[in-house]
Amino acid sequence: MSTSDDIHNTTATGKCPFHQGGHDQSAGAGTTTRDWWPNQLRVDLLNQHSNRSNPLGEDFDYRKEFSKLDYYGLKKDLKALLTESQPWWPADWGSYAGLFIRMAWHGAGTYRSIDGRGGAGRGQQRFAPLNSWPDNVSLDKARRLLWPIKQKYGQKISWADLFILAGNVALENSGFRTFGFGAGREDVWEPDLDVNWGDEKAWLTHRHPEALAKAPLGATEMGLIYVNPEGPDHSGEPLSAAAAIRATFGNMGMNDEETVALIAGGHTLGKTHGAGPTSNVGPDPEAAPIEEQGLGWASTYGSGVGADAITSGLEVVWTQTPTQWSNYFFENLFKYEWVQTRSPAGAIQFEAVDAPEIIPDPFDPSKKRKPTMLVTDLTLRFDPEFEKISRRFLNDPQAFNEAFARAWFKLTHRDMGPKSRYIGPEVPKEDLIWQDPLPQPIYNPTEQDIIDLKFAIADSGLSVSELVSVAWASASTFRGGDKRGGANGARLALMPQRDWDVNAAAVRALPVLEKIQKESGKASLADIIVLAGVVGVEKAASAAGLSIHVPFAPGRVDARQDQTDIEMFELLEPIADGFRNYRARLDVSTTESLLIDKAQQLTLTAPEMTALVGGMRVLGANFDSSKNGVFTDRVGVLSNDFFVNLLDMRYEWKATDESKELFEGRDRETGEVKYTASRADLVFGSNSVLRAVAEVYASSDAHEKFVKDFVAAWVKVMNLDRFDLL
């Protein structure tokens, strides 16, 4: 413990007394704000993936750069790489096919259809936590093997595209015909902060399958891609794993047939690695020492590589031809009887007790072994529904090949959005229902057509609130994670969206707009819905004394009901939309956190979110036409009244009940209730970051800036799914 003499002595020498200890003096060290207030609102989620972290700069155009790529030259190089075994990570049977397939699968397999997050679309496997997940052991080696190819082709191919293409080439080089490949995944340069991987604090914590249905989680254990291959909570029971398998694959939007095809197809090639106890394996890449240079899981068991490799701790080879495509997975599954055993690492697996030694050793041609399977592989035989599908694939290998090709394509492209985002020479021509297909455009409105339509909308009798509400309801379904939803397609007029509670008021405007569309015959309903919002915003700005032009880009089309997967679109129904002051359930997070979640899905910044909420309130765009947050006496006028009155100290706020979801703003002197508000309103005065933005818009000189910012953010949301404008 230092004394005053110590301080005096160091001061006398000219040294700062506070720089002598062992405290971390680096930027960001020390107790953080979140340490003090762990429930602090995550406004920072709206700032991720900015150009400040992008070394390529904001002018970089990946689609343009990809067009310069020697695509088939790249595939040729990948094919050669598959059999160029490296001494620092030798290839099993001289082929990296199984490793690259696993890399692609585990990159894409983090996708969750419930919120559209995860997936392979951003190359997130390069970053924590995914680069160090227990289920991704040794995939650091796969990515490092790809580096010379990435280095050669530079920015003409993103890491995200390269990971998936490498998996495709691995399948093709093993004799399998894939369904196709669509490029277009753009890299990001930092980890996704918005993905909820779960609340557990320890790796491989077990989750009950029923819990997965209530949360946007894609795995039964923290740190796994899908399920524990040893059965739920290491139970070793194939039948009990069925529920977990259905839950996890179902959360990706896969049905039973796709699930069986993916498991069997993924386990037709390659092997698992469990040569010895996992206690020999060192820290993951994020925890490894600096000299490991981004690699992790260094093993001290034997050579640590090749025949001595330890990955999952399981030691399983499924087929007689682990580098060539076959139907041996199903043949072995049903031909032999299986007994539970353990790998050299002690992991639970199964061995074909009555089989001869027909499986080749990956490194010693003189050795053979019996077929082995994972606990979850046997689920495909013992679960009644999975068994029916598996036996059909056993007897019809072509049906299996077709099912796997389509399921693999879906797995690896599910988070890319509509097919219009795909680029490259191997994009399949067929439209698939999970791509949310759209018809070809049939309208090409001229500038005069648009002017005429705007007059018709303005004279329709619809209020500013109705015009703005219907446009927002159509466009705000967009999800930045998987690029689903949005105004293109006018699916607001179709099932299930037209029946959502949140859209009850908005859809009342649809018959009027549908009539205008039918009578004019000049534009799609999708365009007219967005144009209605344009008219509403321009009228509201004019009423506020500002003449503005809201940009509008025609070209949207109208989807048909048969192009709309109702079950998958049900997942886009919001449990909350703070922009419309809507909340369906109170058992999920806080209202203000759900507002941030919605804004993040809409790819909004904090200022954009703030401007939109403030504008939506004064335009009277609440889903139920309530007065919550409508801090103005001139509804329908695009003013900054929301911010002015929210920050006015004449009013004090009190919750109306114990839920503290709704509040009354009373005059401090008279006690009169002046306004009512939700948490999605008051957060702009309570949260220090959002209040700082709100203060800008509440200033006396901010009205014109606010209107311009609102219009810019509004147009951004309306065009989020206009990939044709990129």
From Swiss-Prot:
Cross-link (Tryptophyl-tyrosyl-methioninium (Trp-Tyr) (with M-252)): 105-226
A biological-process GO annotation: cellular response to hydrogen peroxide
Disulphide bond pairs: none
Catalytic activity: H2O2 + AH2 = A + 2 H2O; 2 H2O2 = O2 + 2 H2O
The record's account of how the chain is modified after translation: Formation of the three residue Trp-Tyr-Met cross-link is important for the catalase, but not the peroxidase activity of the enzyme.
Enzyme class: oxidoreductase
Family named by the database record: Belongs to the peroxidase family. Peroxidase/catalase subfamily.
Name of protein: Catalase-peroxidase
Organism: Shigella boydii serotype 4 (strain Sb227)
Gene expressing this chain: katG
